[in-house]
Amino acid sequence: MIESKTYAVLGLGNGGHAFAAYLALKGQSVLAWDIDAQRIKEIQDRGAIIAEGPGLAGTAHPDLLTSDIGLAVKDADVILIVVPAIHHASIAANIASYISEGQLIILNPGATGGALEFRKILRENGAPEVTIGETSSMLFTCRSERPGQVTVNAIKGAMDFACLPAAKAGWALEQIGSVLPQYVAVENVLHTSLTNVNAVMHPLPTLLNAARCESGTPFQYYLEGITPSVGSLAEKVDAERIAIAKAFDLNVPSVCEWYKESYGQSPATIYEAVQGNPAYRGIAGPINLNTRYFFEDVSTGLVPLSELGRAVNVPTPLIDAVLDLISSLIDTDFRKEGRTLEKLGLSGLTAAGIRSAVE
């Protein structure tokens, strides 16, 4: 039996459209917010969110569409944050005065360190203590080409999920499990943070396709942008991520293992994984270098990975090289602007101290 709850969906980009449609079609009350009032108006004028594609299809009617974040948050049982991870901090500051004890906040996904950053900012803004969850990746493979429409190519079969405090994960899954059975509890948010495969699959391939992105010639990001050599180098970046996790006594999946868990594939290489994934057909590459594959996945992926590696004395030469090359390429000091350990509330902590902070 599906239990009805009220879900706030904050952010109506690709993933937010998919979440709002999915939950409404599951019979849940959906309070949807976006900062862009014009986008909200266009969805209101359309009268619904139309979901299309092999992953999800139907006409969904959220109970509320608003650009007033307080209206969306104050009466929700579960608050789903579905904005680029670089905006998590501002969302936390903006909702701090509206949230109340007993609410569940989930970052979809948290990238690396999302729940930790969110908790720190809520506390700094005087918010009550609430449970903050995060997933390791986005549930949907989807694209919204215009307000009120979303194409859902696939829904992942399983999603790593953890909470702050770590012991609240079971309670959280009791709240959402009837509509989000894909969420599977792992040890803690350090595990979900170190299972951030976007940090492997986005910055490096985009860097190696920079000329193609700037040329304006359309290309399929995964199917054409990740060649055997690009995939092979991504596997070496992935090995550094896994080494960091092992230093924290965490067993996180490799990217290839993640594809098996998420999509039911059994690839031997990253190249095989992307070529064999029908959900990636038609996903276009960036048309310039002002892309979230840099600004989000370097800031909230490579930066905290590099800093976590340094904290536990794990060398990350490839992660550092990609981070620094992209910083120089687009004249952005990601090491300053990104998610540093200080911004996560972990500055100066040992491996044991960091593990304690995520309990």
Swiss-Prot record:
Catalysed reaction equations from the record: (2S)-2-[(R)-1-carboxyethylamino]pentanoate + NAD(+) + H2O = L-2-aminopentanoate + pyruvate + NADH + H(+)
Keyword NAD attached: yes
Keywords: NAD, Oxidoreductase
The keyword Oxidoreductase is annotated on this UniProt entry: yes
EC number assigned by the record: 1.5.1.28
Pfam families, alphabetized: ApbA, Octopine_DH
GO molecular function, one term: opine dehydrogenase activity
Similarity section: Belongs to the lysopine/nopaline/octopine/opine/vitopine dehydrogenases family.
Binding partners and assembly: Homodimer.
Function: In the forward direction also acts on secondary amine dicarboxylates such as N-(1-carboxyethyl)methionine and N-(1-carboxyethyl)phenylalanine. In the reverse direction, the enzyme also acts on neutral amino acids as an amino donor. They include L-amino acids such as 2-aminopentanoic acid, 2-aminobutyric acid, 2-aminohexanoic acid, 3-chloroalanine, O-acetylserine, methionine, isoleucine, valine, phenylalanine, leucine and alanine.
Protein name from the UniProt record: Opine dehydrogenase
Gene this chain is encoded by: odh
